[in-house]
Design a protein with these regions (language model features):
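Conserved micro-motifs of the catalytic ATP-binding
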Residues: 8-15, 50-53
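Conserved catalytic submotifs in the C-terminal HATPase_c
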Residues: 40-49
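Short helix-loop "hinge" at the ATP-lid/N-box region of the Bergerat-fold HATPase_c
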Residues: 69-70
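Short beta-strand/loop element within the Bergerat-fold HATPase_c
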Residues: 76-88
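Acidic ATP/Mg2+-coordinating residue in the GHKL
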Residues: 96
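Short conserved segment of the HATPase_c
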Residues: 101-115
Length: 172
């Protein structure tokens, strides 16, 4: 995380094929981590065919969002992760019923070294790099990331990144 955050030359994606199995494996790992942390983890994996993107960057992005949800959701809290795709875009939605993010903080959470409520993050750990790095990854993958409230409590992160089908990539 720190190595990527230190880079000033930007993140350069290495595009390769990502199989549907990638999500099954990743979500199985997240289930274990959530269980070990006394959180409830649900997911909906609607990826049924391979697509092209940078798998390592995708995994880092997903893990940053998942780790934040774990960190700011209390015991017995719930985290949901939904993935689906069209021919041109991959969509990730991470929802939690944690402590949420204020409107003022939402404007700054993607800034490097910004930490929501310093006292709260000091307890939880972190350098204020995770969501900044998530934004850099999303930008490198030609996408968007947004955050909104999960009423009555919690946060929803929505990500949309550009992808290609394997057949289109091979023809270029």
């Amino acid at each position: 995380l720190l190595n990527l955050a230190r880079r000033d030359d930007g993140i350069k994606p290495e595009i390769a094929e990502v199989s549907p199995q990638f999500f099954k494996t990743t979500f199985a790992n997240y289930e274990l981590i959530a269980s070990e942390n006394d959180r409830i983890f649900d997911y909906e994996n609607r990826i049924y065919r391979p697509f092209m993107t940078d798998q390592l960057l995708l995994k880092q992005l997903m893990t940053i969002l998942f780790d934040n949800a774990i960190k700011y959701t209390e015991e017995d809290g719930k985290i949901e992760f939904v993935v689906h795709a069209t021919d041109r875009h991959l969509y990730l939605t991470v929802t939690d019923n944690g402590i949420g993010i204020s409107a003022a903080d939402k404007k700054k959470i993607f800034d490097r070294f910004y930490r929501v409520d310093k006292a709260r993050t000091r307890q939880k750990g972190g350098f204020g790099l995770g969501l900044s790095l998530a934004k850099q990854i999303v930008d490198a993958l030609r996408g968007t990331i947004s955050v909104k409230d999960n009423k009555p409590r919690g946060t929803i992160f929505e990500v949309k990144i550009a992808i290609q089908s394997p057949s289109k990539r091979k023809n270029k």
